């Protein structure tokens, strides 16, 4: 629950001075991105801005306290304030904030701005006491907020110091409205108005001006002068002389002498006890101070001018002026030290009764009452955990003695889940093992099963599938059906383990069960995870259309539960969509998906972007754009050297490196990589198959055909046994290259036919295209034989078109520079030298060599088909050939002579 008073603008009191000159300046705030009001305590920042805010309906107010340094708490209140200002316009952002289901503050703010793009009227958000924020993550997020907020949005920040919000940049760009302490200081006219409203006897203007000068226009000092004069029946001038030169850091003695010592004992105790509350209402006051009518007492203190201010229009919530509240809390520690723990306990009880467990924990910690803290956690800790109050929970659990945790082992489980959420895997197992060893008596079987479910999740995250499977099975055997969360975790882990082991059908079944349970119990992140896993399994099985449809369901889930869009898991989904699009040669869409994945991870460590970057390299390679691929590989290799990655990630990164070396003939890099790359022990899943395939590709590049063939034959055996049909399709293509390069043309044709047939199921295109000219030559031969079944014939033509489109190095060889070098080559055929082709005829020869039909050549060169026939007839005559295949062979011989590996 959110405390209402933190979202209420302060009530404007009748006796306050209206700061007309400053309000005039603030009236233009809508022309600036940021209005910044800064000064030390007591200069009237909050009062001024509350005057300006009066009458503005589309304005949110957020009063900070020290607890708002928790990112999740900050986000919840900030979004709630904007919801108040917009009348609930940003419902998606509100749901994400309430459920704590966003990747970072910046991603939450990005969603907020999407919703605010449809809000066209001026909008304001006031954040009071920003100096209390010390969390650098919040500072970074607010800098992002200021950079990207809509043009009709103005942020108003009140702070005792200059906040870390990129102020200089805003100032240079004239996007900053500033009001500082010199402007906030009362002038003579305002001081006179102030005293006229506060003192029963008017004072002369000259006297008022002298007092204003004595305290340099400091509003708090003026208030103290008036209070002292009323309480002691002394002249205001005498009080002013005492305050001259005093600042906020030297007020304590003065406040004791002039305020505390001048109220009765009952009021003094009320002030000291109530000061422990960051905000207060009738029920809290009754419990903390023992007063029977808390509301009446608060209103009386307000009337006495004792620095108490209303926090909302209802008048139910109050707080002390920050300067006075800080002073009172310090005095309370000195004067009521013995009573202080009991006062905090009373506050905690009252907060609990009103449904604010996080505030209750704050007071239980301050009371040092481990038993009370334990009881609050037992009743509310899991709710706080599900709302990501992780920092508060960690602080609370650290405050409990180990014996208390052992007596309440579900708190041990909570502490372990906290560690798991922070990727402290080894600590999780150490903690649980210690607890099991030291818990007295027989441990509850259900709790033990929950321990095992968590251990299973840790094991799979840490790359230990065997242990994960054992623990997940134990958990599922012992967990009651009602313990749905742990059952979802254990089922998901078991399914993931079976995926790793290559048992795809059973893994798919378990992931479907996980999805059903997760949807039923609204555990949406596990529902999304299970859909992603299902899609990966279907891809591995070769059912790419089914994988596509599962991905569509996952995208629909994200659309329905929009908070999921902010999770890193969203990147996983768009990444596997990019992989599928790449396989189908939809390269522009694949690249866009990969880049959207990088955008999802923009606030995370760069290492997290490795997989999407790998896909960008793949797209460049499939297009034959080796320069761009090299540039992207430089970044990829830098990331590889600065992180620890799952073997799947390494396999994918190595794949594009080895393909690049193949396309550029870089045998040195391939040999070096092969020497230092460990060979996996198995090949029973897609990422282990992938790394073995990388090894075989490097061996083929180095001419090590025999060991490469052994590897590929074993991979095929495993792939057929485990029904890893997509891997089988890839393996056949690489085996085709091995046979082709080793001169075994019949074997090459046989496995290519198998690969084409299997591609009817997988839909693979780019996997053929990436093999370049060797694949193009074979496909041209198969097409000319005219023996392929209709579907394979159609696919072969499509693949050849893609190769011709993206791998233009064949055509580029017949440009003017190439022709000039060719004609000057000592081995050029005499017929070419004595009867040279025109530049257009060279272009036509290049396109014939690339497999273009006459119609395609005409379209490529934008001329009539009859013109192309004339060019072909002329070049045939000059080359001394009669048939198209003879021209292709002649072009191939010329390319070989010039040193091109065709």
Swiss-Prot record:
Keywords in alphabetical order: Activator, ATP-binding, Carbohydrate metabolism, DNA-binding, Nucleotide-binding, Transcription, Transcription regulation
Domain HTH luxR-type: 830-895
SUPFAM superfamilies: C-terminal effector domain of the bipartite response regulators, P-loop containing nucleoside triphosphate hydrolases, TPR-like
InterPro entries referenced in this protein's UniProt entry, alphabetically: P-loop_NTPase, Sig_transdc_resp-reg_C-effctor, TPR-like_helical_dom_sf, TPR_MalT, Tscrpt_reg_HTH_MalT, Tscrpt_reg_LuxR_C, WH-like_DNA-bd_sf
Binding site for ATP: 39-46
GO biological process, alphabetically ordered: positive regulation of carbohydrate metabolic process; positive regulation of DNA-templated transcription
TM region positions: none
Matches recorded under Gene3D superfamilies: Tetratricopeptide repeat domain, Winged helix-like DNA-binding domain superfamily/Winged helix DNA-binding domain
DNA-binding region: 854-873
Activity regulation comment: Activated by ATP and maltotriose, which are both required for DNA binding.
Record GO terms (molecular function): ATP binding; DNA binding; DNA-binding transcription factor activity
Keyword Transcription regulation among record annotations: yes
Subunit relationships: Monomer in solution. Oligomerizes to an active state in the presence of the positive effectors ATP and maltotriose.
Function: Positively regulates the transcription of the maltose regulon whose gene products are responsible for uptake and catabolism of malto-oligosaccharides. Specifically binds to the promoter region of its target genes, recognizing a short DNA motif called the MalT box.
Protein family (similarity comment): Belongs to the MalT family.
Protein name per the record: HTH-type transcriptional regulator MalT
């Amino acid at each position: 629950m959110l405390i209402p008073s933190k979202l209420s603008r302060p009530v404007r009191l009748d006796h306050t001075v209206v700061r007309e000159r400053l309000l005039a300046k603030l009236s233009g705030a809508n022309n600036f991105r940021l209005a910044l009001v800064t000064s030390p305590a007591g200069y009237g920042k909050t009062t001024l801005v509350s005057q300006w805010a009066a009458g503005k309906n589309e304005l949110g107010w957020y009063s900070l306290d020290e607890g708002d340094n928790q990112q999740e708490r900050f986000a919840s209140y900030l979004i709630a304030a904007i919801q108040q200002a917009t009348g609930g316009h940003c419902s998606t952002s509100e749901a994400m904030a309430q459920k704590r289901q966003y990747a970072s503050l910046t991603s939450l703010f990005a969603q907020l701005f999407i919703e605010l793009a449809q809000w066209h009227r001026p909008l304001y958000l006031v954040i009071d006491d920003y100096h209390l924020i010390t969390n650098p993550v919040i500072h970074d997020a607010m800098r992002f907020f200021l950079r990207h907020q809509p043009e009709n949005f103005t942020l108003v920040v009140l702070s005792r110091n200059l906040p870390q919000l990129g102020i200089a940049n805003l100032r240079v760009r004239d996007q900053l409205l500033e009001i500082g302490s010199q402007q906030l200081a009362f002038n003579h006219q305002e001081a006179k108005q102030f005293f006229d409203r506060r003192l029963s006897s008017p004072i002369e203007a000259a006297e008022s001006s002298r007092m204003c000068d004595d305290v340099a226009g400091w509003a708090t000092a003026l208030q103290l002068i008036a209070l002292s004069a009323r309480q002691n029946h002394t002249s205001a001038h005498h009080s002013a002389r005492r305050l001259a030169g005093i600042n906020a850091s030297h007020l304590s003695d003065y406040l004791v002498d002039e305020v505390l010592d001048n109220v009765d004992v009952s009021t003094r105790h009320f002030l000291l006890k109530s000061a422990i509350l960051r905000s207060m209402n009738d029920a809290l006051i009754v419990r903390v101070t023992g007063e029977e009518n808390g509301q009446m007492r608060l209103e009386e203190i307000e009337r006495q001018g004792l620095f108490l201010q209303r926090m909302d229009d209802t008048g139910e919530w109050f707080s002390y002026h920050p300067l006075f509240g800080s002073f009172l809390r310090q005095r309370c520690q000195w004067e009521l030290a013995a009573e202080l723990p009991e006062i905090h306990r009373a506050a905690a009880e009252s907060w609990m009764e009103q449904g604010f467990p996080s505030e209750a924990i704050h007071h239980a910690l301050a009371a040092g009452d481990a038993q009370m803290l334990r009881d609050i956690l037992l009743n509310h800790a899991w709710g706080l955990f599900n709302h990501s109050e992780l920092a508060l929970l960690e602080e609370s659990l650290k405050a409990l003695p180990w014996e208390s945790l052992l007596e309440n082992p579900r708190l041990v489980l909570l502490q372990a889940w906290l560690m798991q959420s922070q990727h402290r895997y080894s600590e999780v197992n150490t903690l649980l093992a210690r607890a099991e060893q030291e818990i007295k008596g027989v441990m509850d079987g259900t709790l033990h099963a929950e321990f095992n479910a968590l251990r299973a999740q840790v094991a799979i995250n840490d790359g230990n599938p065997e242990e994960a499977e054992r623990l997940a099975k134990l958990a599922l055997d012992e967990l009651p059906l009602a313990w749905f969360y742990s059952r979802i975790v254990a089922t998901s882990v078991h399914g993931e383990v079976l995926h790793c082991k290559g048992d795809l059908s059973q893994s798919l079944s378990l992931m479907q069960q996980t999805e059903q349970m997760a949807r039923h119990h609204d555990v949406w992140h596990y529902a999304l995870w299970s859909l992603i896993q299902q899609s990966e399994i279907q891809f591995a099985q070769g059912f790419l259309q089914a994988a596509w449809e599962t991905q569509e369901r996952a995208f629909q889930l994200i659309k329905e539960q929009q908070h999921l869009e902010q999770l890193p898991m969203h990147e996983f989904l768009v990444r596997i969509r990019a992989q599928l699009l790449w396989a189908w040669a939809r390269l522009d869409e694949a690249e866009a998906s990969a880049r959207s994945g990088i955008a999802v991870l923009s606030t995370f460590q760069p290492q997290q972007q490795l997989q999407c970057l790998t896909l960008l390299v793949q797209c460049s390679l499939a297009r034959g754009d080796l320069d761009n691929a090299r540039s992207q590989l430089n970044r990829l290799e830098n990331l590889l050297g600065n992180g620890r990655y799952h073997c799947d990630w390494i396999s994918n990164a190595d794949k594009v490196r080895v393909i690049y070396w193949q396309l550029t003939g870089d045998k040195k890099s391939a040999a070096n990589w092969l020497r230092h790359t460990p060979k996996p022990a198995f090949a029973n899943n897609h990422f282990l198959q992938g790394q073995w395939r990388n090894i075989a590709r490097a061996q083929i590049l180095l001419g090590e055909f025999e060991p490469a063939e052994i590897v590929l034959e074993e991979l095929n055996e495993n792939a057929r046994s485990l029904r890893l049909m997509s891997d089988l399709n890839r393996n056949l293509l690489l085996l085709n290259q091995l046979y082709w390069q080793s001169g075994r043309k019949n074997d090459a044709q046989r496995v290519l036919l198998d690969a084409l047939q299997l591609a009817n199921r997988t839909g693979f295109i780019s996997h053929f295209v990436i093999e370049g000219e060797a694949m193009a030559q074979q496909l041209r031969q198969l097409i000319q034989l005219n023996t392929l079944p209709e579907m394979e014939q159609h696919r072969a033509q499509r693949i050849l078109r893609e190769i011709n489109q993206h791998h233009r190095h064949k055509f580029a060889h017949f440009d003017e520079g190439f022709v000039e070098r060719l004609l000057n080559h000592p081995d050029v055929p005499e017929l070419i030298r004595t009867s040279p082709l025109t530049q257009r005829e060279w272009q036509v020869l290049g396109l014939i060599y690339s497999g273009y039909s006459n119609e395609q050549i005409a379209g490529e060169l934008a001329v009539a088909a009859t013109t192309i026939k004339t060019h072909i007839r002329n070049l045939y005559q000059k080359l001394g050939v009669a048939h198209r295949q003879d021209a292709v062979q002649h072009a191939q011989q010329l390319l070989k002579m010039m040193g091109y590996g065709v």
